[in-house]
Design a protein with these regions (language model features):
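Eukaryotic scaffold repeat domains enriched in small/polar residues
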Residues: 21-346
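Bacterial N-terminal signal peptides
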Residues: 5-16
Length: 346
């Protein structure tokens, strides 16, 4: 059996504040990978800003939800050629956070600025809206300085991500304000929640639930970012487990198929304070029970490294798409798990 040790790092950020990056497993096999060069081909005059979300559909196309001068949703084909922009000028687009594609190829966007989770069909037509956008007459939209929404059944507060179980139930990580996970049925009717407006570090509490995924059994995996862990719940949102040896879990995804894998990113923090790169940046590949199989990647501004991984897609467990905030890019990673090697002490 592989022996894993853990380490704990404290780093002082600019201005003197303390960044505590929780335990990371050591002696973990490094999974080699290639990053596809020149992946995205945008038309002349069209630009991408911060890449907040990325998701693939059953045809191999991928969607990017980006913050530029305006929040925009782009579609690209398998080769990375631009296909179209979806919903330009949409009332639901203000401050992009995540995009996901469900098993029927419906497109879901999670917008932190409008407090909305929006379901669209493959053609881009709106089918469902969860949440409520603050009215313009009430002041700023729900950015960091905007109004905080109450933790009501259908009112979200800077939500972060969305996922579904095999029955079509919807799970939303209602992240920056409400510190909870909410379960709705396939028609958007409230069923249950875990967590509360007040952040906490108990087994049913969150401090910025930033990403969410559901496996084939209906278990729910939550990237509990500011608590430096990943929490696992059953389908009724009862606590099952906590994985706290993977650094700061920013995003999580579960691959489909008969053998599902769990991926989570220990993303380097915004701002890249001195010392943080040495302890952050990698993505972990795990069994659903928390067993770490390997890791790949590192913090870097260069191609092939990661500059604040925000979301990822693992429809194919050996082809991982990552969206990065501070490099304004999406990378397509081709993993080589059979060539993984243990690098002690890294």
């Amino acid at each position: 059996m592989r022996s894993l040790t853990v380490c704990f790092a404290l780093v002082f950020l600019s201005g003197g504040s303390l960044y505590a990056q929780k335990a990371r497993a050591q002696n973990v096999p490094e999974i080699p990978y290639d990053s596809v060069p020149n992946l995205i081909k945008l038309p002349t005059g069209l630009y991408m800003g911060e890449a907040m979300g990325v998701a693939t559909n059953s045809k191999g196309h991928f969607y990017v939800y980006t913050r530029s001068a305006n929040t925009r949703l782009f579609e690209f084909d398998q080769a990375g050629t631009f296909v179209r922009e979806i919903g330009p000028g949409s009332y639901g687009f203000e401050f992009a956070h995540s995009v996901r594609v469900d098993p029927e190829d419906n497109i879901w966007v999670v917008d932190e600025g409008t407090n909305l989770v929006i379901k669209m069909n493959p053609a881009g037509r709106v089918l469902m809206v969860i949440g409520h956008r603050p009215e313009a007459v009430a002041g700023a939209v729900a950015t960091s300085n905007g109004p905080a929404a109450p933790a009501e059944k259908y009112t979200l507060g800077r939500p972060t991500d969305v996922a579904w179980d095999p029955q079509g139930n919807i799970f939303v990580s209602d992240g920056y304000v409400n510190n909870r996970v909410v379960k709705y049925d396939k028609n958007g009717r409230f069923l249950a929640q875990v967590g509360s407006e007040k952040a906490g570090n108990g087994p049913t509490q969150f401090s910025l639930p930033h990403g969410i995924a559901v496996d084939a059994k209906g278990d729910v995996y939550v990237a509990d970012r500011s608590n430096h862990r990943l929490q696992v719940f059953d389908n009724n949102l009862a606590f099952k487990a906590s994985y706290d040896n993977i650094g700061d879990s920013w995003t999580v995804c579960v691959s489909p198929g008969p053998h599902q894998y769990l991926f989570t990113s220990n993303s380097n923090p915004n701002g890249n304070a001195p010392g943080t790169w040495e302890n952050t940046g990698e993505i972990y590949k795990m069994e659903l029970d928390g067993t770490i199989l390997g890791r790949f990647g590192h913090a870097s501004k260069q191609f092939g490294g990661f500059q604040v991984v925000h979301m990822m897609d693992c429809r194919d467990p050996n082809t991982i798409f990552v969206s990065e905030i501070e490099s304004w890019r999406v990378q397509k990673l081709l993993l080589k798990p059979q060539a993984a090697k243990t690098s002690a002490g890294k």
